[in-house]
Structure formats: C-alpha cells, structure tokens
C-alpha cells in the first residue's frame, strides 16, 4: 500500500523531484520572510522590533539552508510559479497585512499589529503542523534532517511570540475581535494552502511518474483537508503545545561512527 513514507523515499531517490522540493522550500521561506524587515521598521517598541527582526533573519536563514542543499545538487534557487507561491496566493485573498500597508512609512498602530500578528500566527501554525511531516520524510538524509531540526526550532518560537503578542493585545480589550479574525484568516489560509498543495502534488507526482489514479487520490486528499479546516478552523488564542519538537538529529559524523 502506498504511504507517506514511500512518497518521500521516491522524492529523495529522484533528483528532479528532490530539486523541485528543495527549491519550493528555499524560495518559499525566503519569499515568506522578505517583508518582515520592512515590518520591523514600523515598530516604535524597541523590544518588539528586535523580535520581528529576528523573525526576518530566521526566515532568510531557512531559505539559505535549503538553498545550500539545492546547490549541493548543482542547482540554484529559482522563482516559484504563481500557482506554487503561497505568499502570492495569500495576498490575492486579502490575507493579513497588505503589501501597500507594509510599504507605507507610517508606524503601525494597534489595529495594524493585530492584523499582522493574526496573519503571522495562522501561517506559523501551518508551518509548525507541516514541519514534523517533512522531518519524518527526510530521516534518511542526515544533512537535511539537521536542517529540519533547526528550522523547526525557529518555527516554534515564531508561533509562540505571535501568540504572546496577540494575547497582550487581547488583554487591552480586543479578545473577541482577535478570535473572529483568527477564524476568518484560518479559512483564508486553508484556501491558499489547498491551492498550493494541489499544484505542488500535481507537479511532483508527474515528475515521479505516478499513475493518474494515485495523482487524483492525493489531490483529492488536499480538497478533503481543506473542507475539514473550513468546518473546524481551530482554537483561539491558546499558546502552542509544548514539547512538540522531536529529538535532534545526530551529527552526520557521529552517525557514521556509530555504524
């Protein structure tokens, strides 16, 4: 029976599929973080500015880490097709802070920060949900596994600080509004995620040469997941679960010595 484990084995065994996966991760992380530097410029609170700037550096670092694996294969990162560009899909749905507001030099007010952190919390929750799956899929590649551990640790911190900032804003009388916005943004994000997932699965399964019925089944699963998210858009301002990180990957040289 076909399994998630087999899917990732097929990707790692196919140079073109692996290149496609790594390029999607590298470019996606870089694109997802590029606006954060400008967001930090809107901060009047120096402590908050430090947090947003660190978030920016983390996302750029993630893109660099995945690009390193891509270059080891002899490839450079390339732009994503619009159908595969998660951030462009979100922007098209009026999700989170608009590009126009990010480029506006005025400092963010409280309303701007609510919108920014709602969008950030929702997307970082998705990243936290996906990273363990990717990590399991890359377990046979120790270099990639170490990269995933580093990325996962950062992503947990990102969703934690976004949640904490929203909790502070909620304490100032915005709790009900934030909960409504979280539900709306989770539904919008689910739509963008579904669109990108279907496009990604279609492309990579064609590269892998999967039969039509398997490609159709995998894309149908994306639509089913989307409907589930619409019906159950998630909790409110609860803090993320503790202890979700796996044990770190062993260093390649230590793993080799143990064999």
Describe the residue ranges of each PLM region:
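Non-heme di-metal
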Residues: 1-259
């Amino acid at each position: 029976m076909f399994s998630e484990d087999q899917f990732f084995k097929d990707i790692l065994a196919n140079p073109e599929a692996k290149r496609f996966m790594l390029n999607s991760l590298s470019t996606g992380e870089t694109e997802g973080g590029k606006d954060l530097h400008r967001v930090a410029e809107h901060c009047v609170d120096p402590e908050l500015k430090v947090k947003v700037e660190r978030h920016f550096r983390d996302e750029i670092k993630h893109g660099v880490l995945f690009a390193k694996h891509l270059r080891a294969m002899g490839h450079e990162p390339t732009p994503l097709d619009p159908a595969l560009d998660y951030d462009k899909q979100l922007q098209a749905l009026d999700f989170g802070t608009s590009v126009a507001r990010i480029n506006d030099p005025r400092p963010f007010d409280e309303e701007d920060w609510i919108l920014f952190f709602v969008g950030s919390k929702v997307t970082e929750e998705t990243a936290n949900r996906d990273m363990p799956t990717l990590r399991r899929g890359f377990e046979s590649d120790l270099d990639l596994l170490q990269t995933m551990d580093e990325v996962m640790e950062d992503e947990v911190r990102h969703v934690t600080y976004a949640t904490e900032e929203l909790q502070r804003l909620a304490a100032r009388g915005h709790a009900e509004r934030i909960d409504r916005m979280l539900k709306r943004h989770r539904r919008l994000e689910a739509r963008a995620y579904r669109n990108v997932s279907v496009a990604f699965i279609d492309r990579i399964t064609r590269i892998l040469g999967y039969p039509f019925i398997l490609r159709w089944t995998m894309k149908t699963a994306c639509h089913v997941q989307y409907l589930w998210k619409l019906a159950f858009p998630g909790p409110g301002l609860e803090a993320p679960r503790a202890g979700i990180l796996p044990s770190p990957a062993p260093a390649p040289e230590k793993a080799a010595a143990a064999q």
